């Protein structure tokens, strides 16, 4: 919004040309989202407290968590508010990638909001059924996947439509340009051609998988938000590189026209996340709930797909992957041993993984900070793939 205004006025005020610099707008988006979160946070906490949307705590979990019962949840609305305002103010609103990422983020946010609302307002511990939640995630994920399959390699929505129609005329058998290939980290000249169907399936799995993985990780004060900020900031660097014809050529990456604008979105997400952490650090004054976790995970997955860094997201989001695998392994092993031995057995003391460490004697703050450190190391490793190729 401000970019369009600055471009209109810059002939009369040359200093407004600074708005054309992505880095300037990224910094301003971070500051804007951060300030919105810090200013609005207390009001959001009071409102959630008045609505009596307190978090229920599992009685079979760590006993130290019982004091958290009643802490306001659904605080993810504060994050989404900061992201929305900062992105709308500082991003180029003619950019197609901005809108598809916003659609996925807020679409998943609505799903999470409905789930949280049913749990805490209607006192339904199940919230949305797994089938219902997965259905709506699939609708949004598949829509984004189909659109991105034809937009990643094109420079405008007109070209996206032309490519889509060419695919239809080919009997749904046409391949995609090299820009849409699956990129392998640390290898500069090898990529895997996915084709339209392969791209759609992979994109769907990345977006929906990332959303649920972040949601599973959200279980301790401050645990999930800092990894989201770190991974989002790292993806913002990739977006800046891929969106620049100069840097992408120098670093031997495909140039994806318009991807650089996602740096603004990632910066807004980082600022909003840090503001939320101000109130979510131990002892937390509010939790983000599904409305925040599902939305942020979907955002990370969508940005990773656009900048063709699905594998790097898997690396940098290693904490999310480990948490998800711990749940899958725990459930699978329990069901297998129950059928085999008549009694279910557990691989971990409790899943997701962060609860296993708590029950093993780690303090909550130790788990959180150590997971942050691991994520920072993984993000630096992921960023190293920019040059080590």
Swiss-Prot record:
GO annotation terms (biological process): cell division; cell wall organization; peptidoglycan biosynthetic process; regulation of cell shape
EC top class named in words: transferase
Subcellular location: Cell inner membrane
Entry EC no(s): 2.7.8.13
Enzymatic reactions: UDP-N-acetyl-alpha-D-muramoyl-L-alanyl-gamma-D-glutamyl-meso-2,6-diaminopimeloyl-D-alanyl-D-alanine + di-trans,octa-cis-undecaprenyl phosphate = di-trans,octa-cis-undecaprenyl diphospho-N-acetyl-alpha-D-muramoyl-L-alanyl-D-glutamyl-meso-2,6-diaminopimeloyl-D-alanyl-D-alanine + UMP
Chief localization: membrane
Cofactors named for this entry: Mg(2+)
Transmembrane segments: 25-45, 73-93, 97-117, 135-155, 190-210, 222-242, 259-279, 287-307, 311-331, 366-386
Domain of life of the organism encoding this protein: Bacteria
Pfam families xrefs: Glycos_transf_4 (PF00953), MraY_sig1 (PF10555)
MF (Gene Ontology): metal ion binding; phospho-N-acetylmuramoyl-pentapeptide-transferase activity; UDP-N-acetylmuramoyl-L-alanyl-D-glutamyl-meso-2,6-diaminopimelyl-D-alanyl-D-alanine:undecaprenyl-phosphate transferase activity
InterPro entries, per database record: Glycosyl_transferase_4, PNAcMuramoyl-5peptid_Trfase, PNAcMuramoyl-5peptid_Trfase_CS
Record flagged with keyword Membrane: yes
Pathway per the UniProt entry: Cell wall biogenesis; peptidoglycan biosynthesis
Keyword annotations of the record: Cell cycle, Cell division, Cell inner membrane, Cell membrane, Cell shape, Cell wall biogenesis/degradation, Magnesium, Membrane, Metal-binding, Peptidoglycan synthesis, Transferase, Transmembrane, Transmembrane helix
Keyword check for Zinc-finger: no
GO CC annotation terms, alphabetical: plasma membrane
The family this protein is said to belong to: Belongs to the glycosyltransferase 4 family. MraY subfamily.
Function: Catalyzes the initial step of the lipid cycle reactions in the biosynthesis of the cell wall peptidoglycan: transfers peptidoglycan precursor phospho-MurNAc-pentapeptide from UDP-MurNAc-pentapeptide onto the lipid carrier undecaprenyl phosphate, yielding undecaprenyl-pyrophosphoryl-MurNAc-pentapeptide, known as lipid I.
Official protein name in the record: Phospho-N-acetylmuramoyl-pentapeptide-transferase
Organism name: Paraburkholderia xenovorans (strain LB400)
Primary gene name: mraY
